[in-house]
Structure formats: C-alpha cells, structure tokens
UniProtKB/Swiss-Prot annotation:
SUPFAM superfamilies reported for this sequence: MIR domain
Residues in MIR domain copies: 344-400, 410-466, 471-528
Domain of life where this protein originates: Eukaryota
Protein name per its UniProtKB record: Protein O-mannosyl-transferase 2
Keyword set, alphabetical order: Endoplasmic reticulum, Glycosyltransferase, Membrane, Repeat, Transferase, Transmembrane, Transmembrane helix
Tissue specificity comment: Widely expressed. Has particularly strong expression in ovary, testis, liver, brain, muscle, heart and eye.
Pfam families, per database record: MIR, PMT, PMT_4TMC
Taxonomic classification: Eukaryota, Metazoa, Chordata, Craniata, Vertebrata
Protein's organism: Danio rerio (Zebrafish)
Designated gene of the protein: pomt2
Gene3D superfamilies xref list: 2.80.10.50
Amino acid sequence: MDVRPKENFSQRQDTSAVRHRKTCKVNERAEIPSQPHNGTINGVNKRITKREGGEHISSPSRDAHVPVFILALVIVLSVSTRFYKITEPPHVCWDETHFGKMGSYYINRTFFFDVHPPLGKMLIGLAGYLTGYDGTFPFIKPGDKYEHHNYWGMRAFCAALGSCLPPFAFLVVLELSQSSTAALIAASLLIFDTGCITLSQYILLDPILMFFIMGSVLCMVKFNTQRLGPFSFSWWFWLLLTGLCLSGSLGVKFVGLFVILLVGINTALDLWRLLGDLSLSLVDFGKHLLARVFGLIMLPLFLYTTIFAIHFIVLNRSGPGDGFFSSAFQSRLIGNNLHNASMPEYLAYGSVITVKNLRIAGGYLHSHWHLYPEGVGAHQQQVTAYLHKDYNNLWLVKRLDNSDDLTGSPELVRHGDIIRLEHKETTRNLHSHFHEAPLTKKHLQVTGYGINGSGDVNDLWQVEVCGGRKGDPVKVLRSKVRFLHRATGCVLCSSGKTLPKWGWEQVEVTCSPYVKETPNSQWNIEDHINPKLPNISLAVLKPTFLEILWESHIVMIRGNSGLKPKDNEMNSKPWHWPINYQGLRFSGVNETEYRVYLLGNPVIWWLNLLSLALFVILLTVASLAVQRRVKMEGMMKVHCHTLMEGGGMLFLGWLLHYLPFYIMGRILYYHHYFPAMMFSSMLTGITLDILLQNLQLLFSSSLSHYLMRGGQSVLLLGFIYSFYLFHPLSYGMRGPLAHDSASSMAGLRWMESWEF
C-alpha cells in the first residue's frame, strides 16, 4: 500500500528564484546529513536516487498518484460515523447549554460574555440560522427537550467539521511519510475513536477548533512541498490558506496559539535554511521573509480582527454580559441603560448611584443581606463586587453629618468631600475597620454596618477625583474616583479575587493600605438618579473599535483564568488524559436515562501511548546513527528521515498541545486533550508503519512481506472491533450501569474510574 514517487528531482524543471542549484553528493559513510538540507521540521521526506558518481537525496515528486480510493473510503467512514444518530438524544447535552445558547444570542443579536473568542459561536449561530433555527430555545440546562426546535442543523455543522479530521490526518501523514499504509492507520485511529465521534456530534467548539488546527497543519505541510516553486500560484495558495486556518484556530479558542507556535517554528527553520543557501541572493531571501510575514502574521491578524469586528456589529443589543465590561463599552449596546442615555452630569448629595470598579471585569460595588461567616473578620454584612446589573448595586450618597436637606437646590459632591454611602436595599453604610480582609490578608475588611443609615466614624469616606483639585465636581462616568477611608487611611479596592461559596463567588472588596492609584482602587459613577438635577446626553462616551477590542481580550483572559470547578465536579489532571483515566458524562446518570459518555476508545488511546514511547526510542536510535555516521541501506535512510522530520514535527505538535496544560491555573477538562490526541494518532501511523516495514531486518523478504500485511490487517481489524465494543459510549446506552453485572457494558469497564 506504499506510495513511492518515481520522479527524480534532477528531472524536474526548476523555475524558481532558487534555480540552478547543484545536487550534492552524499558521503559514502555519512548516508544521512546530520542537518537535513530542508530543516528539521517540514512536510517533505527525502528519497534516495541513483546517479552516476554516487547516491543523492532528493525530494519526492508532488505528481505521485494519490490513493484516491483509500481517501474516499476514509471520507465515507468518517462521515457515516459522525452523522449516525446525529439527532439523538433529542435534548441538551453537556456544554450544548452554553454554546447552543450563544448561537441563539447571535441570531437574536444579544450581547453576551464568554471566555473564548467569538468565531466558533458565530459559526454555530450561522449554521442554526441557515437551517431554520429561530434562536428561541432557552438552553437552560442539560436534559431540556428540544421539542419542535431545529437543533439538528447546528449539530450537523459540528459533525461536518468533525468528519474532516480523519481525511486531513490521512493527507498530512501521506505527505510526511509517503506511505498510504501509515496514512490509513492514522486516519483509522480518528475514525474509530469513540471520543472523537462524541465530540463531533454535539453543539460544541471542539470540532470547530480541531478542524482549524488540522487544517493549519495540512496547509503548512502542503506549503512545505512547494519549495521547488516559490511564488507560484500553488505556493501562495497554501501559504495564504495556512494563514486563514491559523486565524480560525485562534478565533475559536486561545488554544489555537499552540498551532500558531508550531507553524512559527516550522517557518523559522525554513527561513534559516534559506538564509544558509548561498545560491539565494539576499534580495530573494527578503522576498521570502516578507511573503511569510504577510501570509502568516499580517493576514491572520487582519482576519482575527475582522472576526471581532463582525462580532461587535452583530451583537449590538444589551444582554447578560454587559456587566463584565466598562461603562463606556456598555454605552454602545442598544437597550442598555447607558445607550443614548441622559442623566445628571455631576454627582450630588441625595443621588442614588451605582459604582463600578475600573479594573476590567472588576464589577459593581454590591451588598446583600448575607453576613461574613464566623472566623472571617467581623460578623457583619458582606460587601462585594458583582459583575451583573442588580438592584443590590444601588447606593445612596449622604453627607458627613447624615443630614438630608430636601429643600432647595442639591449640593454637588466635590473632590475632598467626606461622605457616607448607604446601601439602598439594606440601609447599612459602607464600612471598614481594622479586621483582615477575607482573602487578601494585608488588606482590611469592608462591610455593611449600621441601621437605617446610622453608624459610626468607620463609615466615613473621602472622595478623591484622580487628577483633580480640591473643589472639582465629580462627573458621572467620566471622573475616575477613589474612596479613602478616614479612620484607617486605606483606599476602597476590588482585589479581583473570587470569594468562596459563602460569598456567592462574587469578587472580594477590600480596603487597601497601598494608596497608589491603580485600576483596582479606581471607580466611576455609572447609574445616577437625582430628579433635582438636569440631564445631559452621554453619547460622547462611545469607545473606539480598538478600545473595545482590547477590553474584550482582557475580560476574556481574566475570565478564563478565573474558571473554577462546580459543586461535585472533579478537576481533571493532565496526566489523566493520555492514559484515558476518566471520561465525561454528556447525558444521563442513571439506568433509566439515555446515557452518552465521552471516553476515548481505550485500545486506540493506549496504542497511541505505547507508540509515543516507541517513537522516542526510534528517534533516539536514528539520531545516534546519524551522529555516528552509520552506513544505512536505501529504505533505512528514508525511514530515518521520516522519523526525524515528519515524526519530529508531529511529536512537537503533541508536546505543544499537551504540556502547557500542566502550568495552567484554570479548571481543566478531559476534552482539552483531543487536539494533542490528533497529533499522537498521526505519529502512531508513522511509527507503526516504519516498524512493520522494518520486519525485513529480522525475517526473509517473503516472510516479512506477509508479516507486514498481517500486522496491518490486525491493526485495522483491532480498531474496528474495539469500536464495535465501545460504540454505545458515543451513540447512547440505556439499562444498568457498567458496574452492574447485568449491564451489557459490564465487561468493558476496564478501569474503576470509568463511570458509564
């Protein structure tokens, strides 16, 4: 099944800027150069050819016959496994409650907040819209019936992109190894993996992300094969398509940065190779450099920015995500109380206000009837920062002496004034004292204290307008204000830390002894109600596109790092993933419910793990052989290059998509491993194929041929049979759970941590 190109490099017409190069002889002992001519990471394997005067290493022809029948079979199997029972179960499963809802928001043009960039949700919403979904299903919780709503279009879109992964893997491995056997093994690992199937069948970001990651790798490999014809149409096509896929990867999730790094390393090595080519002028090298800067940096940045521009244009109506953003950001949203709003320009005594922290995603100053628990400072009313608009965000501005002059014109609050802030709902004053803050130990606790506005001297705060002078009035929305506590000298601050369950997971508010001006200690007056004052228009506050783009990224990054596990939810560990330690419940928990369980096919995953170890051993042996200039026969040279170049690129891709999770502080889930799993599967295809082909070193030619074909057949049949055993995990189960001996899955619970 191997595809070995027949055309010699020396027979090809080279019309590129690097034409007229000479093909160098290979030293009789040094059969493989220690530093391959085209770099360590690329998509072209060397081929050994015979010419007068010795052996040469040259690139395989790109005109070699592609095994169309095998590729067609891969496509058919991939599509059929992903679309089978696509409408079942007819209820919300796992994170469909998030991403289906967000697709609805796009259809309804309602603004929301999410920790991921918008492209994936935009495409889900577009798929739903084009297939007749009207955006009215609420997606409240897993298990809710879809009933008459057209949810299938969004699932089908995700399944279609998921169906592309095995064909992409086939083409990538075919380019890297020039072996259709290796390509078929790699594709089969993805076709028959129950985990990949499950992720592809629901309204999730994962199949969209993996589509763009695999597309980026395929386009990069294809671009590498165009080295003999730089600046040709196909050369530009694959370069620009690589940039397009990179922008798509990053536009779905920030995990796309890992494949950008992979392509960046490949590009850097490629440019280093060109720089060392003395037949290439510096002018031509500059053209190569500028072309890659345009195709792999400028184009992806432009497309990525365009994604956000469309996102902001479509989501122009106020929604549940408003409170995560600044007052200026909210003023552009139709339906928000700040959009085209008018309110009093200057703060006055007797005004009812909301106070928003200027730290991005800092929240509104908030209180409620709940008290700090015993052992956490004083047992008084909690004061927090809350990210959503709420009645408990309202505060009444009162004078130092607590008097209310209801007659005459209102008196403005000015820089240097000493005020009280009374919580509108509970009538307790904003208060601080010499008790330690709940989380930030060097800060002081902030509480609500007093009854009906009466309290003590610890309720007094001095207003300071940042950059202002004594007597300057406080401007609503535009003035940056700080509140200095008179009794302790500290400054009101939002620490950005999330309180435990007793604090309703809201943001900690403290009084900081560090009085230096920072966004954490700066606030602005957002809502302002005072019927005695004239109103002015706030339209001038709308921010520029670059300002909202920057703010969106800061909010996403902080939101992502702040994700914590829910109640009774296990935080998956990265070391769990390669060994398939534990899956995820997508639907159902008991024997009467329709159960779907995200778990990789254990035969495939454990084979991938074994192949990783085998690859490291083979790579070490090959590297030592090259370093010691060991003489090798023809096919051994090809296999050595395949391991070091094609295998090296895939191994690096696996490392880049797996190791960073060990240093992430956010909650992690099992499904985060699947991009790395794709690289592992492609590497398995190359590793096993090389092992099978090298059986000829141990056995006679005829016997090794039969053993190789037998090994290939055993592998493929093993994938199919293991898929047959575990397919209920993807397509649904009913009846007793696997720990019950009466269950049809009882004998398949090979690890106690599996919960199906």
